[in-house]
Each structure stands twice: as C-alpha cells, then as structure tokens.
Design a protein with these regions (language model features):
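Bacterial N-terminal signal peptides that target proteins for export
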Residues: 1-7
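Extracytoplasmic copper-binding redox domains, predominantly the cupredoxin/blue-copper superfamily
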Residues: 20-146
Length: 146
C-alpha cells in the first residue's frame, strides 16, 4: 500500500499543530462589566508550551511580567502599549502580569503554568495596594477552582 505525499503532509501538519500548545486570549480593558483597569480573565491555568495572546481591546494598555512574581529561570517580557502581545510560557510556575501604566490602579493578573505549588505564593509587599488586592483575589479564585 502506498501512502501519498498529500497524506504524509496532512499527518505531519496535524502532529506539529498539536505539539505547539494552545493559544489563550486575554483582553486588556479600561472598563469591564465588573471593574476598571482589568485583564479578562484575571487568572489562567495553562500547560507549559501554551501561548497567551494579550489583546488591547481598549487602548492605553500593555502586558508585561511583574518583577517578583516570576518563576526561577523564566524570561521577563514587556509588550508595547496598544499592541497585541503573544507570549509562550515554557517554565512551570506562577507568573504575575502587569499593565505598566496602570499598575497602581490594580491592573494585574496571574498565569499558572502547570500545576500549582502546594505552598501559597508570597507576593511582593512593595506592590501598590490595589494591585496586591487584585492578585490576592485571583489567588482566591484559583483555590476555588481546584
């Protein structure tokens, strides 16, 4: 039995696509139905190798890693204001994400790559109060989702 070139091409395309991981979308919003200056969703749990696409649904926002909430060995990143940013997360752990211009207003989110640690994460006490409050709420929603 002969396998056609087209069959081999289709099979390899399917295998390569499934090995790349999923793409998750996060909206960057000035106002949502619930609050102002938010990422929607504010918490994601993804697999290593998955990509998150940060979409500037409303203008004036970016997505950047939050110093102090980054797994050891992970690369920091910083997207441009008003630009869609895609970031692939390969190192397991908890990532804090911030909108740099709106950090003081609490525009932050968490991304858990892989399974959460059994110990509760320690968030930097130097963060603005609103940012710290929102991160703690996101951590609580993570606990409820278990």
């Amino acid at each position: 039995m002969r396998i056609s070139s087209l069959t081999l091409l289709l099979a390899s395309a399917i295998l390569c696509t499934s090995a790349l991981g999923q793409v998750h979308e996060v909206k960057m919003l000035t106002r949502s139905a619930h609050a102002g200056m938010v990422y929607e969703p504010d918490y994601l749990q993804i697999a290593p190798g998955d990509t998150v696409k940060f979409i500037p649904t409303q203008s004036g926002h970016n997505a950047a890693s939050l110093p102090g909430v980054l797994p050891e060995g992970a690369q920091a990143f910083k997207g441009q204001i008003n630009q869609e940013t895609e970031q692939t997360f390969t190192v397991p752990g908890l990532y804090g994400i911030q909108c740099i211009p709106h950090l003081a207003m609490g525009m932050v989110m968490l991304i858990q790559v892989g399974e959460p640690s059994a110990t509760a994460p320690v968030l930097p006490a130097t963060l603005p109060k609103r940012a710290l409050d929102r991160l703690n709420l996101a951590l609580q929603s993570r606990q409820v989702a278990k």
